[in-house]
Amino acid sequence: MTESYSLPDLVEAAAEVRKQAYAKFSNYKVGAALLAGDGTIFSGCNVENSSFGLTICAERSAVTAAVAAGRQTFQALALVTEKQGAPCGACRQVLAEFCGDEFPIHVAAAEDLGDIKTSTLGELLPDAFRF
């Protein structure tokens, strides 16, 4: 299902949840806002852990919140990071489980929410593993 959505609202939701990020070790805070097929926005932030491998990225936090609420189709993702950092490989693969290659990923800089870089999942993860 594809509906129109307000990109500024999606970015603002990501900026708001970024404030809740627990980035004690890296100080690199990320907020994610995932737009479900029904128009609901699910937010997530990164949560670091002293055992670094247990850190949860903002994107996966948003996806798991959405799935836990019964949503499995998504329209778009907005991220707010310090310097428009792209999703890590693990997050790209998790998104590929639910989203096609044309799924839009919008990344805004925390200092300027109007500075948005848009890519598709397929551009960021060509030849994604799909079982």
Kindly label every feature range from the protein language model.
Residues 2-23, 71-131:
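C-terminal binding/interaction regions
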Residues 13-16, 58-66:
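Short, well-ordered amphipathic alpha-helical segments that serve as non-catalytic structural scaffolds
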Residues 27-36:
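Short beta-strand scaffold segments in enzyme catalytic cores
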Residues 35, 64-71:
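Alpha-helix C-terminal capping segments
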Residues 36-38, 111-112:
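Short acidic-glycine loop/turn motifs at beta-strand connectors
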Residues 46-60:
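Compact, glycine-rich, soluble single-domain proteins
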